[in-house]
A protein has these predicted regions:
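Ferredoxin-type iron-sulfur electron-transfer modules and their immediate structural context
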Residues: 1-75
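Short, intrinsically disordered, charge-balanced linker/junction segments flanking boundaries
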Residues: 261-267
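Iron-sulfur-cluster electron-transfer modules
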Residues: 21, 30, 60-260
Length: 267
């Protein structure tokens, strides 16, 4: 059994987390942990990867084992799926704690996570697709759609002011799977939907949710909110991507003002 040296503990660690915790819940909700182990039972990686035990992670946070938490593997091996919170009787937002630690305590993100966030900040989308390539892909898929359904009036509208729905794409659909673009447009056409997409900011994905970068997350959400206002649409529709839906639905309440985020989001 490992020895815990009390002199090495930093009791203020929980307060440091609470001060920067982007959440709609009690910022100290993790202090409600009962150590019951339901989170560990829910975690898909518990006992599969070393250190992947949410219950132990929370205990380390509460005890103030700051260095062990920051240098451990848990914060980066966690997928932030939220299964632990779903089963937690106290609703402790473990994924939110992981996200907060990733982005606010000087730990370096592994692999290309930060690169993806930087791409989205610098180019408008996380795969650095140029506006020219994006618009050409939409035009190409519009032509394919017209040919397939034998209707020259079928459209993939761009920057249509006053449409009911503003649709956000996954950059992978644009870059690697353009047939998905055609399929979505076909559904919209068959439904008779009054919809559009933006020529400027159209990326549904939001990797600031995973990196813990609140500043980046705010910028990305504001860009989408500006498109909603600019195009005067009623609803925002997000392509099939779980984290993108969460980022738009939950994120706009956290990172935007009530006025900026006053629009419904559908998936």
């Amino acid at each position: 059994m490992a020895v815990i040296r009390t002199k090495a503990l930093e009791p203020k660690f929980r307060q440091e987390i609470a001060q920067v915790f982007a959440t709609l819940q009690d910022k100290l909700d993790f202090s409600h942990c009962l150590a019951c182990g339901m989170c560990s039972a829910a975690c898909a990686f518990s006992d599969v990867h070393e250190e992947m035990d949410p219950r132990k992670f929370i205990r380390k946070v509460l005890l103030g084992m700051k260095e062990e938490v920051l240098n451990g593997q848990f914060i980066w091996n966690c997928s932030m799926c939220g299964r632990c919170t779903m089963l937690c009787p106290m609703g402790v937002d473990i994924a939110g704690i992981v996200r907060t630690i990733r982005g606010n305590f000087g730990v370096k993100s592994p692999g290309f996570l930060q690169e993806v966030v930087d791409n989205q900040l610098n180019t408008g989308n996380q795969m650095a697709v140029s506006q020219e390539d994006y618009l050409e892909t939409l035009e190409w898929m519009e032509e394919e759609l017209q040919a397939e359904i034998a209707d020259p009036k079928a459209r993939i509208p761009v920057d249509k002011v006053g449409a009911d729905f503003l649709f956000l794409w996954d950059p992978r659909e644009i870059k690697y799977y353009p047939q998905d673009v055609q399929s979505i447009a076909k559904i919209m056409h068959a439904a008779g939907a009054n919809w559009t997409c933006s020529s400027e900011y159209w990326d549904a994905t939001h990797y600031g949710l995973f990196s813990g970068d609140d500043e980046a997350s705010t910028i990305l959400l504001k860009r989408i909110a500006q498109q909603v206002k600019k195009l005067k649409v009623q609803y925002l529709v997000v392509t099939e991507c779980g984290h993108a839906t969460r980022a738009q639905r939950w994120g706009r309440k956290v990172w935007l003002s009530p006025e900026e985020g006053d629009y419904p989001v559908y998936n």
